[in-house]
A protein has these predicted regions:
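Charged alpha-helical initiation segments
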Residues: 1-58, 70-77, 82, 88
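Generic structural signal for well-ordered, non-transmembrane alpha-helical segments
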Residues: 7-10, 14-17, 58, 62-66, ...
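Charged/polar positions within long, soluble alpha-helices
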Residues: 21, 28, 65-76, 198-205, ...
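Amphipathic, Lys/Arg-enriched alpha-helical patches that create a basic surface
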Residues: 147-194, 198-199, 212-243
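Inter-helical turn/loop segments and adjacent helix faces that build the functional surface
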Residues: 206-212
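Beta-strand/loop-dominated core regions that host nucleotide or nucleotide-derived cofactor-binding catalytic loops
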Residues: 245-343
């Protein structure tokens, strides 16, 4: 599952947080210096704050842009583990790919694409279109040139078949908790960061400086947005797996015990192994909707047997009708479905 892009962003944001924490106490520390030093600090402090503000915004947006593009590439890398053929990819990706491949081929002189060779591009295109392998080049979808406002982010991910990003993202933690307290603002802080970055890049006067505490609020918001986006993308990957991967069996719960944390199933001719792969599909109003898990320890008995026949199992090759149950970390309903995979 996706996590590398988020971890790298958190590391970079941590550097910005530490800098602003230090910068906010710097005047107090420096004023304890000599009189001459205090005069120098007082006279130059406005310029220092302007430079600090510009550095913060440029750094923050740079981290965010890097995260968005890294997430797109990581999403494709994870797709390789799910979609083993070109035809298994979303229609939007297949429809856009050739034109974007052509555009990338003409931009290989850009610094960000210099590790990609024409030979590699031709080989990957041949393997994808002729041999039906999933060897798409993620960089084909990284050609917007930056300025990742909310609408640009939406467009970037819509080419991957993810058309409901802006409508759905706010339902994932931690944004859902943030917006429940502050009201939904259409992710406006992201656009504000981009606008401020563009003003600085084009030499506008810094008339509207942000305090270190407000900068840290922006940093915290970017981190929340990134966490929710990563959860959303992982959910989309698991949804794709649900659609195309062939499970051994899809089961549904029939009974619930101990405040719904123990779920019971009734299946015929079932094979169960502790720690076998499971993919849980929740109803539409749950976020995230898909959860990848391992089958926990379970108990089972023949369907017609008495309750005293229930035993603990690590592995079961059950001919005929069987009842089995296991404990979960959350409540299920009869609308939940669980896909079981033997390998």
């Amino acid at each position: 599952m996706m996590q590398d892009s988020l971890l790298e962003l958190k590391k970079l944001l941590g550097t910005i947080k530490l800098h602003n924490t230090c910068f906010s106490v710097l005047p107090t520390v420096l004023k304890s210096s000599t009189v001459n030093d205090k005069d120098f600090i007082t006279n130059s402090w406005t310029n220092e704050r302007i430079f600090n503000y510009r550095s913060n915004i440029i750094s923050l947006y740079g981290c965010f842009e890097q995260f968005i593009e890294s997430s797109i590439k990581e999403y494709f890398n994870e797709l390789l583990k799910i979609c083993h053929s070109f035809t298994e990819l979303d229609e939007s990706i297949r429809r856009e790919y050739i034109d974007r491949w052509k555009t990338l081929h003409g931009r290989l002189h850009f610094n960000k694409f210099q590790t990609i060779t024409p030979t590699f591009m031709v080989k990957s295109l041949y393997n994808s279109l002729v041999k039906d392998k999933n060897e798409i080049i993620a960089e084909c979808f990284l050609q917007n040139g930056g300025n990742y406002k909310i609408e640009e982010i939406r467009k970037s991910f819509s080419t991957l078949g993810l058309t409901n990003l802006n409508e759905t993202l706010r339902n994932y933690e931690p944004l859902v908790s943030y917006y429940s307290q502050n009201g939904f603002d259409n992710y406006s802080k992201i656009d504000e960061i981009v606008d401020r970055r563009n003003e600085i890049a084009h030499g506008a006067n810094a008339d509207d400086l942000l305090s270190e505490s407000i900068v840290l609020d922006y940093v915290d918001y970017v981190e929340m947005y990134a966490e929710s986006l990563t959860s959303y993308l992982n959910d989309q990957l698991l949804e794709h797996k649900w659609k195309i991967a062939n499970p051994y069996r899809i089961i549904k719960p029939i009974n619930f015990y101990t405040r719904n944390s123990v779920v019971e199933f009734h299946e015929k001719d079932i094979i169960l192994r502790e720690k076998m792969d499971m993919l849980v599909k929740k109803p539409k109003d749950y976020f995230p909707r898909y959860v990848r898990e391992k089958l926990p320890p379970f108990r089972a008995k023949k369907a017609q047997a008495s309750l005293s026949a229930i035993k603990n199992y690590n592995e079961l090759y059950g001919d005929g009708d069987w009842m089995f149950s296991f404990q979960t970390n959350y409540k299920m309903t009869t609308k939940f479905r669980i896909a079981l995979y033997l390998s």
